[in-house]
Curated annotation (Swiss-Prot):
Record HAMAP family: LeuD_type1
Protein encoded by which gene: leuD
Coiled-coil residue spans: none
Single biological process term from Gene Ontology: L-leucine biosynthetic process
Complex and partners: Heterodimer of LeuC and LeuD.
Xref: InterPro entries: 3-IsopropMal_deHydase_ssu, Aconitase/3IPM_dehydase_swvl, AconitaseA/IPMdHydase_ssu_swvl, IPMI_Swivel, LeuD
NCBIfam families from the UniProt entry: leuD (TIGR00171), PRK01641.1 (NF002458)
GO terms, molecular function: 3-isopropylmalate dehydratase activity
Family annotation (PANTHER family): 3-ISOPROPYLMALATE DEHYDRATASE SMALL SUBUNIT, 3-ISOPROPYLMALATE DEHYDRATASE SMALL SUBUNIT 2-RELATED-RELATED
Gene3D superfamilies recorded: Aconitase, domain 4
Disulfide-linked positions: none
The name this protein goes by in its record: 3-isopropylmalate dehydratase small subunit
Catalytic reaction list: (2R,3S)-3-isopropylmalate = (2S)-2-isopropylmalate
Pathway(s): Amino-acid biosynthesis; L-leucine biosynthesis; L-leucine from 3-methyl-2-oxobutanoate: step 2/4
Organism per entry: Cereibacter sphaeroides (strain ATCC 17023 / DSM 158 / JCM 6121 / CCUG 31486 / LMG 2827 / NBRC 12203 / NCIMB 8253 / ATH 2.4.1.) (Rhodobacter sphaeroides)
Length: 201
């Protein structure tokens, strides 16, 4: 999993509330088990017309936000069905952080397991960040996981809280497999001891 320590980049404003996982990655793209390649279908029905042409008004189709790494979103982001393809698609597009007043629990947990930092902040702070994001490509927002702060392009800094274990995993690029591999020597030792004690197994 890709490490997350600090990201400075363009933040895309998405004030719509209740953006669900079917909006993030529609069901017709869930047949794959590959984590790569889903970025082109992120927000598919919001980004594209039925003929495949781009909808120019959609924020990620606008030149200022095509390379966004951060999304500042409306309330209850990631609600709906528990598809892990949603964070896969966000990450494949290049999104490393989503800031909102609240997230659906399963989506929130899946983000941490896939290298994305979901940040919960009070409504008044999210509104300040949303306004900063509306300034476009000239406005660079910084998300510092080590310091646990979000800093706007004009230098306003806001603290956020994140579970210490999840913070450790993100900063060290550890998903569930990575955490298991950290214990590889102990696991190998246990298996050797078990083979000695129970050679018939």
């Amino acid at each position: 999993m890709q490490e997350f320590t600090k990201v400075t980049g363009v933040a895309a404003p998405m004030p719509l509330v209740n953006i669900d996982t079917d909006m993030i990655i529609p069901k017709q793209f869930l047949k794959t088990i590959q984590r790569s390649g889903l970025g082109k279908n992120l927000f598919d029905e919001m980004r594209y017309n039925p003929d495949g042409s781009e909808i120019p008004e959609f924020v990620l189709n606008q030149p200022a936000y095509r390379d966004a790494q951060i999304i500042v979103a409306g309330d209850n982001f990631g609600c709906g069905s528990s598809r892990e393809h949603a964070p896969w698609a966000l990450l494949d597009f290049g999104i490393r952080c989503v800031i909102s007043t609240s997230f659906a629990d399963i989506f929130y947990n899946n983000c941490f397991k896939n290298g994305i930092l979901p940040i919960v902040m009070p409504p008044e702070v999210v509104e300040v960040l949303m306004e900063d994001a509306r300034r476009g490509a000239n406005a660079r927002m910084t998300v510092d996981l080590e310091a646990q702060t979000v800093t706007t392009s004009d230098g306003q800094s806001f603290p956020f809280q994140v579970d210490s274990f999840r913070r450790h995993c993100l900063m060290n690029g550890l998903d569930d497999i990575g955490l298991t591999l950290e214990k590889a020597a102990s696991i190998d030792g246990f298996e050797r001891d078990l083979a000695t004690l129970r050679p018939w197994v």
